UniProtKB/Swiss-Prot annotation:
Keywords, ordered alphabetically: Nucleus, Phosphoprotein, Ribosome biogenesis, RNA-binding, rRNA processing
Record's keyword annotation contains Membrane: no
Gene field: NOP12
Modified residues (Phosphothreonine): 181
Further remark: Present with 5910 molecules/cell in log phase SD medium.
Protein name: Nucleolar protein 12
Length: 459
C-alpha cells in the first residue's frame, strides 16, 4: 500500500498519516460473492393486498355507475380484462398447497368407491331398470292350457243339435276309460274309484270347431239358427281338462273309438302323435265331399288304423281331394298299396233308402308318403334380437302349438295400468278416411250442386 502511494505522491511522513484512515485502506474485503447478492430477501409491504382489493372495489363502482347497454352491443364489445397483480412471493403462491393435496386424496377415494362393482338385481337379470315396467306376452297361460287340451276329430254334427248325444259325448270323455274295461269284484271299491277318477277327468270346457255352414252368414248367427252344411256332417272338438294327467290316458285309450258310428281321432294338442311316413300312405283322387268314415271302412281290412286325416280348406271346411292314412303296423302299408286304382264305396254317394250308389265310384290313387322338405317357418311379429335363450324357446314352442289369433299377438308388449300411452303403440282398428282430391270429378260435381242449391234458395 505504501509503495503505491509513494509512487503517486512521493515519500510521506508517517507521522502525518492518520491511523484510522490507514487501517481502513489496509484491510480489504476482497471480490464480491454473487450468491450472497441473490439470497437477499425482498421486503414486501403488508398493505399491498389491501391496496389491490380497494382498486377492484373502485373499478366495480365505476362499472355500476355506467349507463345500461343493449345485449347486442355487449356481445360485440368485450370488456377489458383486469390484470391480477402477481404475487410477490413463492410462499404466497403455495399457501393452500396442503389443503388442496388432502382434498385431492378425498376425491380419489370417493371415485374408487363409485367404481366398485355392486351386485344388484339389474346386474343379475341384465335388464335395464326402465324395462321393468314392460312385459312381453309369450302366451304362457295359453301354453299351460294347451297342456290340458285334447283334440277330437270326426265327430258327428248331431253333438251340437242333440242334447242326448252331447251328454253321451261328455260322459265318454269325462270318465276314466280304463275303469270301464276292467271288471272289479267289490262294488264299493268301484264307486270310490269312480269318484276319484271323476275328479281327475273333470272337464273345464268343450269347444267345437271346423263347422261348415250352408249360407254365407256370420258364424254366430248361422250357429244359432243351425244352418249347417248338408253334405258336411262331421266336426272337430277341443276338450280342456282341469288336470294335466288325464290327457295321456284319454289319448292312449280313446283313440279310434267308435262313437255314433264314427271312428274318433283323439290326440294331444301340446304333444301330438308323430307322423310316421313309413307307416302312412297318401290317398288321392277323393271327392271334395268325402268323409273320414269311408276311408276307415275301405282300409280297415289291411290292418289296424291309427288315424285318418282328410286335408280340408280352412274357410269352407270342405275337402281338397286327398288324405293321409296311418297304420299301427308297418306291414299294413304293403297291403294298402294293393288297393291302388281300385274304386271305393262312399257313404255320401249312396241313397239313404235304397243304399244304391248315386254316383260312379272313384278310383283311388294310393302311394307311399314321400320325404318332403320343410317349408318356410310361420312368421310372427316378434323381434327375437332382444330376447334371451329361454324366451326364444318359449316363443318357438308357442308358434307351433297356438292358433292363428294367438300367433298374431305373440311377443307384443302387455299394457300395464299406470303407463303413459305413446303415439304409434296402439292400433285404432279403424280405417282412416282418405282425403278427397281438390281437383277431382267428385269435388267439381259437389261444388256445382251447392251453387245450384244456393241459386234456387235465392229465387
Amino acid at each position: 500500500m505504501s509503495s503505491a502511494i509513494d509512487n503517486l505522491f512521493g515519500n510521506i511522513d508517517e507521522k502525518k498519516i492518520e491511523s484510522s484512515v490507514d487501517k481502513l485502506f489496509s484491510s480489504s474485503c476482497g471480490p464480491i460473492n454473487k450468491l450472497e447478492v441473490k439470497s437477499k430477501t425482498r421486503t414486501v409491504l403488508p398493505d399491498s393486498k389491501k391496496r389491490e382489493r380497494a382498486a377492484e372495489a373502485d373499478q366495480e363502482e365505476k362499472e355500476a355507475s355506467k349507463p345500461d347497454v343493449s345485449d347486442e352491443q355487449t356481445e360485440e364489445v368485450a370488456l377489458p380484462k383486469v390484470k391480477k397483480a402477481k404475487k410477490s412471493k413463492r410462499n404466497d403462491e403455495d399457501e393452500d398447497l396442503e389443503a388442496r393435496y388432502y382434498a385431492k386424496l378425498l376425491n380419489e377415494e370417493a371415485e374408487a368407491e363409485d367404481d366398485k362393482p355392486t351386485v344388484t338385481k339389474t346386474d343379475e337379470t341384465s335388464v335395464p331398470l326402465t324395462s321393468a315396467a314392460k312385459k312381453v306376452d309369450f302366451k304362457e297361460d295359453e301354453l299351460e292350457k294347451a297342456e290340458r287340451t285334447v283334440f277330437i276329430g270326426n265327430i258327428l254334427s248331431t253333438v251340437i243339435t242333440s242334447k242326448k248325444v252331447y251328454k253321451e259325448f261328455k260322459k265318454l270323455f269325462g270318465t276314466n276309460p280304463i275303469a270301464e274295461t276292467e271288471e272289479s269284484g267289490n262294488e264299493k271299491e268301484e264307486e270310490s274309484s269312480k269318484k276319484s277318477d271323476n275328479n281327475e277327468f273333470a272337464i273345464e270346457s268343450i269347444r267345437f270347431r271346423s263347422i261348415s255352414f250352408d249360407e254365407a252368414l256370420p258364424r254366430k248367427v248361422a250357429f244359432v239358427q243351425q244352418k249347417f252344411h248338408k253334405s258336411r256332417d262331421t266336426i272337430n272338438a277341443y276338450i280342456v281338462y282341469k288336470n294335466k294327467s288325464a290327457v295321456r290316458k284319454i289319448c292312449s285309450n280313446l283313440n279310434a273309438v267308435v262313437f255314433q258310428d264314427h271312428h274318433l281321432r283323439v290326440d294331444s294338442v301340446a304333444h301330438p302323435a308323430p307322423h310316421d311316413k313309413k307307416r302312412s300312405i297318401f290317398v288321392g283322387n277323393l271327392d271334395f265331399e268325402e268323409i273320414e268314415e269311408s276311408l276307415w271302412k275301405h282300409f280297415e281290412p289291411c290292418g289296424d288304423i291309427e288315424y285318418v286325416r282328410i286335408i280340408r280348406d280352412s274357410k269352407t271346411n270342405m275337402g281338397k281331394g286327398f288324405a293321409y292314412v296311418q297304420f299301427k303296423d308297418l306291414q299294413s302299408v304293403n297291403k294298402a298299396l294293393l288297393l291302388n286304382e281300385k274304386p271305393m264305396k262312399s257313404q255320401k254317394q249312396e241313397d239313404e233308402n235304397t243304399k244304391k250308389p248315386t254316383k260312379k265310384a272313384r278310383k283311388l290313387r294310393v302311394s307311399r308318403c314321400k320325404n318332403m322338405k320343410k317349408g318356410t317357418t310361420i312368421g310372427t311379429g316378434l323381434d327375437r334380437n332382444g330376447l334371451t335363450d329361454s324366451q326364444r324357446t318359449r316363443a318357438g314352442r308357442a308358434k307351433k302349438i297356438l292358433g292363428k289369433a294367438d300367433r298374431a299377438t305373440l311377443g307384443q308388449e302387455i299394457t300395464i295400468e299406470g303407463l303413459r300411452a305413446k303415439k304409434g303403440e296402439g292400433s285404432t282398428h279403424l280405417k282412416k278416411k282418405k282425403q278427397r282430391s281438390a281437383t277431382g270429378r267428385v269435388t267439381k260435381r259437389s261444388i256445382a250442386f251447392k251453387k245450384a242449391q244456393a241459386e234456387k234458395s235465392k229465387k
